[in-house]
């Protein structure tokens, strides 16, 4: 009886590990659009991915950048400068890291997948926050 219980617990543990790993998708990064958006090949298709929980400054003078400047009381030039810096931080971090995975959490109103990126078991979304490359963002559909 004891052996059966141990075997059942072992099987349950292994299936939990397998199921958890199934939530993650291997991704080949094809483009870093900015500090919080990338493109990558997942399951044979290139998809745009928005990193969940973070919002980086824009890298060009688009309408959203002017809004960021106004809300944060900084110049549009400073917004773009910080946006470019965020993009560089993400590019540098991803350099020479072939084992990148993504865990999808949603799809946004622009039809981008929303998710958490991991490289070498490091949560890249959190890393970007720690580096000061972005602000906390609560995703709204």
Question: Locations of the language-model features?
Answer:
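Small beta-barrel nucleic-acid-binding modules, primarily SNase/OB-fold domains
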Residues: 5-8, 16-141
